[in-house]
């Protein structure tokens, strides 16, 4: 077990953190992130650090201990730095463009796919790279996964939408009979 919950989360300058009603509320300017922890872990703020401790000694309490520490760390990191995912489009005639509050994808279907950009997410397109940015790690990952799901990469030619750092295991095509 990694015991990640033992490590306190540092509160950077410019970020205000409050604990109320089973929630950790972090604010920076007009951005707000909330992490709901209920009564599963004990949370306190000690000398500009958020400290977590498990409620009991059972396995589930220890699991929640690390989970809520990681969620809180992601919320604070999102407010200070933000998160980014990049997708790459491969294929003849495959392209993407941002039009207003929608992402228009042409992925070899008879019609373009219009994906509405959610609140708090910025999408930019440069050649065949789609960049997704936001301050909520879960939302950024979800949007990237949804866009990828429209045309996942196929194993023969590698056509489709893939993450920039993703490796596609290629298959050999059929060979002619001798």
From Swiss-Prot:
- A Gene Ontology biological process term: cytoplasmic translation
* A Pfam family: Ribosomal_L6
Gene behind this chain?
rplF
- Molecular functions per Gene Ontology: rRNA binding; structural constituent of ribosome
**Could you tell me which Gene3D superfamilies the record lists for this protein?**
Ribosomal protein L6, alpha-beta domain (3.90.930.12)
Ordered alphabetically, the record's keywords are: Ribonucleoprotein, Ribosomal protein, RNA-binding, rRNA-binding
Q: What InterPro entries would the database entry show?
A: Ribosomal_uL6-like, Ribosomal_uL6-like_a/b-dom_sf, Ribosomal_uL6_a/b-dom, Ribosomal_uL6_bac-type, Ribosomal_uL6_CS
Q: What GO CC terms are in its UniProt record?
A: cytosolic large ribosomal subunit
Q: What is this protein called?
A: Large ribosomal subunit protein uL6
- Known partners and oligomeric status: Part of the 50S ribosomal subunit.
| Function noted in UniProt | This protein binds to the 23S rRNA, and is important in its secondary structure. It is located near the subunit interface in the base of the L7/L12 stalk, and near the tRNA binding site of the peptidyltransferase center.
The answer to keyword Metal-binding applying to this record is: no
What family is this?
A: Belongs to the universal ribosomal protein uL6 family.
């Amino acid at each position: 077990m990694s015991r990640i919950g033992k490590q306190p989360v540092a509160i950077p300058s410019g970020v205000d953190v409050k604990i109320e009603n089973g929630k950790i509320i972090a604010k920076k300017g007009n951005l707000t992130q909330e992490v709901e922890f209920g009564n599963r872990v004990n949370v306190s703020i000690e000398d500009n650090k958020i400290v977590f401790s498990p409620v009991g000694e059972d396995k589930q309490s220890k699991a929640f201990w690390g989970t809520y520490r990681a969620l809180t760390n992601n919320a604070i990191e999102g407010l200070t730095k933000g998160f980014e995912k990049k997708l790459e489009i491969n294929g003849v005639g495959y392209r993407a463009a941002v039009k207003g509050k929608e992402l228009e994808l042409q992925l070899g279907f008879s019609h373009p796919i219009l994906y509405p950009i959610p609140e708090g997410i910025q999408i930019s397109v440069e050649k065949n790279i789609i960049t997704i940015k936001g301050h909520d790690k879960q939302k950024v990952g979800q949007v990237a996964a949804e866009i990828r799901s429209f045309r996942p990469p196929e194993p023969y030619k590698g056509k489709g939408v893939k993450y920039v750092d993703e490796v596609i295991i290629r298959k050999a095509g059929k060979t002619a009979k001798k």
